[in-house]
Amino acid sequence: MLKPTWLRVKAPQKERIGTINRLLTDLKLNTVCEEASCPNIGECFAGGTATFLIMGPGCTRACPYCDIDFDKSIRTVDHTEPTRIGEAVSRMRLKHVVITSVNRDDLADGGASHFVACIAAVRAASPTTTIEVLIPDFCGNLNSIDKVLAAKPEIINHNIETVPRIYNRVRPQGVYQRSLYLLDWIKSNDKNLYTKSGLMVGLGEIDAEVLEVMADLRAIQVDVVTIGQYLSPGSKHLPIDRFVTPTQFDNYKAIGELEMNFLQVVSTPLTRSSYHSGEFRNLMRDNPRQN
């Protein structure tokens, strides 16, 4: 299936990308931008932003849509990683940072303690940087979620990924209701925290199902939703079922913001979980909450 013209991306600024890549290489850090073959890597790196991928690069799950390497071996966590992330945030002068992880089902708490350490390291190295964490489902372990909550990042993101009807095919080790419950638990325990979720389209869902997922998310007071076109990483991954038009992405945004009252819906063909995440600071400013 040929990509339509609206999925073309601008050539990246090689000089800026090279600078960021050298820094990440020097500090031995991974980014989801590279590991997941994100189409926005040029734009984000050129703008001096990155989403750090911790506890990787191998993932203990093998979701058929994802380009991150599968690795079910038992691996220790690198306890120097949080300090290196803090240093990178400081050297890159990031105003907003996103920290995400692979699934680490081999760890007792799914890696929640490592998230906490990374949040603390960023706070120490760059106190004014706002922190967003994109967390796995921790196999539904609420104690793990509570650890991350206690560290008080500004925003917690957990992606719902797709619609219930095709969940088992797209995310075989995930559970739709479990992800909803996780997001509900987060908001129920800290109503001042901003919550976020995202999904892909083009996997076999229909537009009505996308809107139903958005309604489910808004019912549990999720604040921000991201919606983007699924792009198959290769022949061993799930195929693309359809290309959603820019007009329909605009419709998702309009319905989400004007009718469902999300604070923000980021909905474009190239949107990914952390796309334009730096704009979150403006969202906080315009919609302040108590600390």
From Swiss-Prot:
Keywords: 4Fe-4S, Iron, Iron-sulfur, Metal-binding, Organellar chromatophore, Plastid, S-adenosyl-L-methionine, Transferase. Pathway: Protein modification; protein lipoylation via endogenous pathway; protein N(6)-(lipoyl)lysine from octanoyl-[acyl-carrier-protein]: step 2/2. Its cofactor is [4Fe-4S] cluster. Its main location: plastid. It is found in: Plastid, Organellar chromatophore. Residues 45-263 form the Radical SAM core domain. One of its GO terms (cellular component) is organellar chromatophore. CDD domains: Radical_SAM. One of its GO terms (molecular function) is metal ion binding. It catalyses: [[Fe-S] cluster scaffold protein carrying a second [4Fe-4S](2+) cluster] + N(6)-octanoyl-L-lysyl-[protein] + 2 oxidized [2Fe-2S]-[ferredoxin] + 2 S-adenosyl-L-methionine + 4 H(+) = [[Fe-S] cluster scaffold protein] + N(6)-[(R)-dihydrolipoyl]-L-lysyl-[protein] + 4 Fe(3+) + 2 hydrogen sulfide + 2 5'-deoxyadenosine + 2 L-methionine + 2 reduced [2Fe-2S]-[ferredoxin]. [4Fe-4S] cluster 2 binds at C59, C63, C66. It holds the Pfam family Radical_SAM. The keyword 4Fe-4S applies. [4Fe-4S] cluster 1 binds at C33, C38, C44, S274. This is Lipoyl synthase, organellar chromatophore.
